[in-house]
Amino acid sequence: MASYRKQRIENDIIRLINRTIINEIYDPVVKLGHVSHVKLSADFFHAVVYLDCYDRSQIQTVVNAFKKAQGVFSQMLAQNLYLAKSVKLHFVKDDAIDNALKIEQIINSLKN
């Protein structure tokens, strides 16, 4: 039962942050990024937000811009999530795409 609630809150965090990017944020660098997935701690107080953007060369700039806009995201989550304590957000770049590309290159090199 708790895992269902955790998964639901993770999905709500993704939805709310992406909605905030569209409606509330005016920084063009933040608009380049999007949330790929969220990992919420067991106590629901810390969330690691994995970010991705279409231009992989600007990913660190996007992560820094998200860290600067963290207050807006935290305020939106506090208003819309019904939790005892506000969620602390930690923004990191999502390495899943880079790892998948490396694996694909290795597989292609083995085929040849």
From Swiss-Prot:
Chief site of localization: cytoplasm
UniProt keywords, alphabetically: Cytoplasm, Ribosome biogenesis
Gene Ontology cellular-component annotations: cytosol
Domain of life from the UniProt record: Bacteria
Gene3D superfamilies in UniProt: 3.30.300.20
Pfam families with a match to the protein in the record: RBFA
Family according to the record: Belongs to the RbfA family.
NCBIfam families cross-referenced by the UniProt entry: rbfA
Protein name: Ribosome-binding factor A
Organism: Mycoplasma genitalium (strain ATCC 33530 / DSM 19775 / NCTC 10195 / G37) (Mycoplasmoides genitalium)
